[in-house]
């Protein structure tokens, strides 16, 4: 039971991280003037892509424990 609860909570966390980073990246790509305090748009976008990739990798690894 605890195993399932922990795995589910981790899955929710990683999916939320993906959603948050994807939403922010979408804003950067569609409305870059709205993010005036970040002059390094490419660096910031790269960080967001990295967050998405990391969370997706964690989800992939998590699937191994769900077997």
Locate predicted features.
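Extended, charge-rich alpha-helical interface modules
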Residues: 2-67
């Amino acid at each position: 039971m605890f195993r399932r609860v922990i795995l589910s909570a981790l899955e929710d966390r990683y999916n939320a991280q993906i959603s948050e980073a994807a939403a922010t990246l979408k804003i950067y790509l569609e409305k870059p003037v709205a993010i005036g305090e970040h002059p390094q748009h490419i660096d910031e976008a790269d960080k967001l892509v990295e967050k998405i990739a990391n969370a997706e990798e964690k989800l992939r690894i998590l699937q191994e424990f769900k077997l």
